[in-house]
C-alpha cells in the first residue's frame, strides 16, 4: 500500500512509500532513513507511537494531536512545528530542537528533553509531569530545569524556569526581576507597572520558594 506524506500548505508530495501492511509510521520512518526533508509535512493526528525518528527534519510540520508516545526523536529538528495537544509521553527528545514550536496542551510526561532547545516554544498548558528538563534550554543560557511552573490566565503567560522568569515576551534572570526598579518595569510595556505592582510578590515567591 502506498502512503504519501504531503505539504500542509500546497498538498505537494514530500515523500511516498509503498510496502505491505504500510502505515504512516512506517512511511515516516522510511522518509527519515532516506534523509527526506519533511518540512511542512501534514501529520495531523498521526499514530507515531514508538517511531524511530532520530535526526528527523520536520520543521514547521503540522503534528497537532499526533500520537508519539515513546517515540525516538533524538536530535530531531522540530523548529516551528505545530505539536498542539500532541502525545509525547515517554518520548526521547534528547538534543532535539523545538524552537518556536507550538506545544500548547501537549503531553510530555516522562519525556526526556536533556539538552533540548525550546527557545520561543509555546508551553501553555503543556503537561510536563516527571519530564527530564534539567539541562533543557529556552535559548542561550536559559536553563528550564525540572518542574517548571506555568501561570496562565493573567495579562501575560508566566513561565518560571530554573534560572529565569519569562513574563509575556520579557525573559530575565530571577535576580534581575527581583532587582528591577519601578522605572525599569515601566519601560517594558504600558500595562507593566500596574501588573507588576499587583503580582510581583506572588511571582517572586513562586520563583524563589515555590519552585524548590
Q: Which residues fall in each region the model found?
A:
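N-terminal capping/linker segments that flank leucine-rich repeat
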Residues: 1-37, 140-212
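Tandem repeat scaffolds
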Residues: 19-155
